[in-house]
Amino acid sequence: MVYWIIIMSTFVLDQLTKARAEKFFVDSPVNLLGGILSLTYVQNRGGAFSILEGKRRFFIIVSIILILFLCYMIFKSTSNLYKFSFSLIVGGAIGNLFDRIVKGYVVDFIDIKVIPVFNLADFFITGGVLLLTFLILKEGGEELFLKKKP
């Protein structure tokens, strides 16, 4: 149950921040931290780093498959940390999928200058992938499906 709350919370937070970006940053970006960080509005019609721009249908199909697979992994995994990492990825993926279906593009707005502009969904996906990678490297993936001891 808690993992579905994490998924919904990340989705809602992502959508709320994107709505604010659309309202306030379209014509007037905000520079913060001496210009190191900017809040600006960007329509991303590709994937991460704007790769495969214009391949909307591809990203929708891949996102749906990934979301379904990771929801299955949440259900099957016995490790709370794995479930948490999957939940972050799913919540972020749903946020970007929603944008692609409803708007035809993903709203990005966080600009740190040294990396491409991104959004909170991307942040959650990246955090979930980093945690998952760390867990697999640390544990070898054994914790994914081990049965809990009675």
From Swiss-Prot:
<protein>
    <recommendedName>
        <fullName>Lipoprotein signal peptidase</fullName>
        <ecNumber>3.4.23.36</ecNumber>
    </recommendedName>
</protein>
<dbReference type="GO" id="GO:0006508">
    <property type="term" value="P:proteolysis"/>
</dbReference>
<dbReference type="Pfam" id="PF01252">
    <property type="entry name" value="Peptidase_A8"/>
</dbReference>
<keyword id="KW-0472">Membrane</keyword>
<dbReference type="InterPro" id="IPR001872">
    <property type="entry name" value="Peptidase_A8"/>
</dbReference>
<keyword id="KW-0645">Protease</keyword>
<feature type="transmembrane region" description="Helical">
    <location>
        <begin position="85"/>
        <end position="107"/>
    </location>
</feature>
<feature type="transmembrane region" description="Helical">
    <location>
        <begin position="58"/>
        <end position="78"/>
    </location>
</feature>
<keyword id="KW-1133">Transmembrane helix</keyword>
<keyword id="KW-0812">Transmembrane</keyword>
<feature type="transmembrane region" description="Helical">
    <location>
        <begin position="117"/>
        <end position="137"/>
    </location>
</feature>
<dbReference type="GO" id="GO:0005886">
    <property type="term" value="C:plasma membrane"/>
</dbReference>
<comment type="pathway">
    <text>Protein modification; lipoprotein biosynthesis (signal peptide cleavage).</text>
</comment>
<keyword id="KW-0064">Aspartyl protease</keyword>
<feature type="active site">
    <location>
        <position position="122"/>
    </location>
</feature>
<keyword id="KW-1003">Cell membrane</keyword>
<comment type="similarity">
    <text>Belongs to the peptidase A8 family.</text>
</comment>
<keyword id="KW-0378">Hydrolase</keyword>
<feature type="active site">
    <location>
        <position position="108"/>
    </location>
</feature>
<comment type="function">
    <text>This protein specifically catalyzes the removal of signal peptides from prolipoproteins.</text>
</comment>
<dbReference type="GO" id="GO:0004190">
    <property type="term" value="F:aspartic-type endopeptidase activity"/>
</dbReference>
